[in-house]
Amino acid sequence: MSFNTFGHMFRVTTFGESHGVAIGCVVDGCPPRIPLEAAEIQTDLDRRRPGQSRFTTQRQEPDQVKILSGVMADPDTGAQVTTGTPIALLIENTDQRSKDYSEIKDKFRPGHADFTYEAKYGLRDYRGGGRSSARETATRVAAGAIARKIIAGVKVRGALVQMGPHKIDRDKWDWDEIARNPFFCPDKDKAAFFEDYLDGIRKSGSSIGAVLEITAEGVPAGLGAPLYGKLDADLAAAMMSINAVKGVEIGAGFGAAELTGEANADEMRSANDGTRFLSNHAGGILGGIATGQPIVVRFAVKPTSSILTPRQTVDRAGHETEILTKGRHDPCVGIRAVPVGEAMMACVLADHLLRHRGQVG
């Protein structure tokens, strides 16, 4: 199985399966002498960690990260810093329950990657989905914590802005509210609504999708490249690579199709510190290159495929049958995808920053 590596100058290779001994990643391209402690990575991992509320999977994984290589004590300060060599990170799996999946080892779950993995490789890891499981995203969050150190000064944040058909009120957006509820929701009133809404879905054994918004403030103008090295193209690819993501938009996104040229164009004026934009329909990127405005990316996450409702399917022999999925699953996988989206944003920006330095100095 190839294609486990993401990035060009800042490269992340992930490994491991949902029910294997461990998962992890190797980060290549991190500059030397950047202060880095496991506790800094752990902070980001704890935001994504499962089992923290009734609205996420009850699989209990501490997600304790170990730094295996790529760091040492700075000879001048004594602080632990990166060496410039590959950084290997390991997260042990501790709460696998593979027996929950024994009844579906020969059946394909509708909406899941079971069928396509079998079609490509001739077999699949039915125990929690193997590499196709969202368990893999913990390694992305770990890599993203390192990327954040490279892009110090850039603020990357994310929020859940829609669950099912229910959208937040953007006039009530409060970044501080995100840490106060289990949904990463910036709208206090809508977060309270989501509690009852998702409780009903969870108790019925079903699931629901969501829309997440990731922003990056402080990105310098000029980051990115034209044509085949576009910053927005890499961001779209990064977000689409996250499990269960089915759509990505930058700035106004698909809404731009409803605007006139006058409404869509972000007009510019002169300011004391440079150029000032009067709007941000472009989402901070024009021609594949950052404008200096906040970068705004949204992505849609489909409902979790593993649900308790019986569904029609076929088995490996091609026989028609019925399937009911047991195990522990997120009723809305979009909730824990917020830190994952932030991590992918950080990784792309770190990669482009290093590429930018290599091209223009």
UniProtKB/Swiss-Prot annotation:
Catalytic activity: 5-O-(1-carboxyvinyl)-3-phosphoshikimate = chorismate + phosphate
Known EC number: 4.2.3.5
Keywords, sorted A to Z: Amino-acid biosynthesis, Aromatic amino acid biosynthesis, FAD, Flavoprotein, FMN, Lyase, NADP
Domain of life assignment: Bacteria
InterPro entries: Chorismate_synth, Chorismate_synth_AroC_sf, Chorismate_synthase_CS
Cofactors (names): FMNH2
Residues holding FMN: 131-133, 243-244, 287, 302-306, 328
Listed pathway(s): Metabolic intermediate biosynthesis; chorismate biosynthesis; chorismate from D-erythrose 4-phosphate and phosphoenolpyruvate: step 7/7
One protein family per Pfam: Chorismate_synt
Chain residues that bind NADP(+): 48, 54
GO molecular function: chorismate synthase activity; FMN binding
HAMAP family: Chorismate_synth
Function: This reaction introduces a second double bond into the aromatic ring system.
Quaternary state and interactors: Homotetramer.
Protein name (database record): Chorismate synthase
Species whose genome carries this gene: Bradyrhizobium sp. (strain ORS 278)
Gene: aroC
